[in-house]
Design a protein with these regions (language model features):
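A conserved short coil-to-beta-strand element within the FAD-binding core of flavoproteins
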Residues: 79-90
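Short, hinge-like loop/turn segments at secondary-structure boundaries
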Residues: 63-66, 151-153
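Rossmann-like dinucleotide/flavin-binding elements
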Residues: 2-58, 94-107, 111-160
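Short, conserved active-site loop motifs that form the nucleotide-linked donor/cofactor pocket
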Residues: 3, 74-76, 81, 132
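Helical element adjacent to the flavin cofactor pocket in flavoenzyme catalytic cores
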Residues: 66-75
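Residues that recognize and position ribonucleotide moieties
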Residues: 76, 84, 101-103
Length: 160
């Protein structure tokens, strides 16, 4: 009941209840969400990330700026930890040495990552025999620049 997706957290701020927010996943989306909640809404987010560092695919300079902002906002970060379970307003996490910690959470935000979704493209190809070219997040979760290039090249292949 108190677990929502990172997309819902961005789109529906009223779904983010209370002050103590645990964000499960420290990629770009999770870090961005934490900063937004702290800076714009006065929440106290905590980030739990399984990898040793936050947003590993992020450009180094941008990641350094992001980490500085997280520190300035006093956002707690647990790296090298995995979420074991979520229940009764608490998130149980395990570090690499299997030490368990419990975090209080009024709301838990799932930012574990996203997968591409090209079900519509597949259905159109199957039903109508159309050649459908996917671009952006339905093709591969990535960066805006890649989506723009894919869109440009897809558009250039359309027959007149």
């Amino acid at each position: 009941e108190n677990v929502i997706s990172v997309l819902d957290a961005h789109r529906h701020k009223d779904m983010v209840k209370g002050e103590q927010i645990v964000i499960c996943g420290g990629g770009l989306s999770g870090c961005d969400c934490a900063l937004e909640l702290a800076m714009e809404y006065g929440k106290k987010p905590v980030i739990v990330e399984m990898m040793d560092k936050l947003a590993p695919k992020m450009i180094m300079m941008n990641r350094a700026s992001m980490q500085r902002m997280l520190k300035e906002q006093n956002i707690e970060v647990y790296t090298g930890c995995r979420v074991e379970k979520v229940e009764d307003g608490r998130v149980s996490i395990l570090d690499k040495d299997n030490n368990r910690s419990t975090l209080r959470a009024d709301t838990v935000i799932s930012a574990f990552g996203m997968r591409s979704d090209n079900l519509l493209a597949d259905a159109l190809e199957k039903k109508y025999g159309w050649r459908v070219r996917t671009v952006g997040d339905c093709n591969q979760i990535g960066r805006v620049g890649l989506a723009i290039r894919e869109g440009y090249f897809a558009g250039s292949t359309i027959d007149e």
